[in-house]
Amino acid sequence: MDVYRAIADPTRRAILDELADRSGQSLFELCARLTMKHGINSSRQAITQHLDVLEAAGLIRTRREGRSKLHWFEGGPLKAIAERWPISTDERTFER
């Protein structure tokens, strides 16, 4: 999966925000935090599909612990994008 397509969806960006803030969450924890902090009331099945897309893009990694599957943020692909197109804070960059 393409990283750009993975981050194009606002729900997936919210999932990444939550995992960047607190990695190692289960699906249940993620769904609760998405509802409370972002007002996202998607089903567990829908969030699972979003997590699958993010994992395929290399933006998250998972590990099973007992019956739970835990999710971690993996920033490597985003770091590669930032390194490819660095953002300058120099005001002259924006002048024409």
Residue ranges of each PLM-predicted region?
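Amphipathic alpha-helical dimerization/coiled-coil segments
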Residues: 17-21, 74-96
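Short, hydrophobic-biased segments on the C-terminal half of alpha helices
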Residues: 51-52
